[in-house]
Design a protein with these regions (language model features):
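A short core secondary-structure module
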Residues: 13-54
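Glycine-rich beta->alpha junctions and the first turn(s) of the following alpha-helix
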Residues: 53-151
Length: 169
């Protein structure tokens, strides 16, 4: 998504694809590229009523949260709507470190839930006169799943401790 200087503001063209809760939102914080490189990224505030702004078809993530693509066709952004100019991106994303840890925790919880559902099934399902949890091949699968879950937990803990100490993501 590119922002080009136009009068006292900017013209923005491009798109954003995975924008959480976008079907219901009217105002958006949009990252734009003023020029190449990490120092060329900043952000603007955009309203759905702005000429050239449109939304795509609504879809859902696996957790049921809705999203839709956002399209910008030469949308004029007045200078009052420029939140961060070029170089502001580094400051703005520093707040995402905690969010990344939350996303990791959510994924770990989903993995644990799936493991427990599979375990209950293996403890009750019978095949050839035995519970399927008694078959060695099934036990290997459960061992591998548990190792992956615990490795994920340790990585999550390490990330949380390091983020609290101010280490970069």
């Amino acid at each position: 998504t590119k922002a080009v200087k136009y009068g006292k503001g900017f013209r923005v063209s491009g798109s954003k694809v995975f924008t959480s809760n976008s079907p219901d939102a009217d105002i958006f914080l949009i990252y734009v590229r003023y020029h190449e490189g990490i120092n060329g990224i900043g952000s603007v505030i955009m309203d759905t009523s702005m000429l050239g702004f449109s939304k795509g078809k609504s879809s859902k993530y696996t957790n049921g949260e809705e999203w839709c693509a956002l399209y910008f066709d030469n949308v004029y952004i007045p200078e009052d709507n420029v939140l961060l100019g070029p170089g502001g991106f580094k400051k703005q994303i520093s707040g995402f470190n905690a969010e990344r840890i939350g996303n990791s925790a959510r994924s770990l919880a989903l993995g644990e839930f799936a493991f427990n559902v599979a375990k209950e099934y293996a403890l009750t399902r019978e095949q050839f006169g035995k519970k399927i949890c008694e078959f060695q091949g099934i036990q290997w699968k459960f061992s591998e799943m548990k190792i992956q879950i615990e490795a994920g937990r340790l990585l999550l803990y390490r990330a949380a401790i390091n983020a609290d100490k101010g280490f970069p993501s």
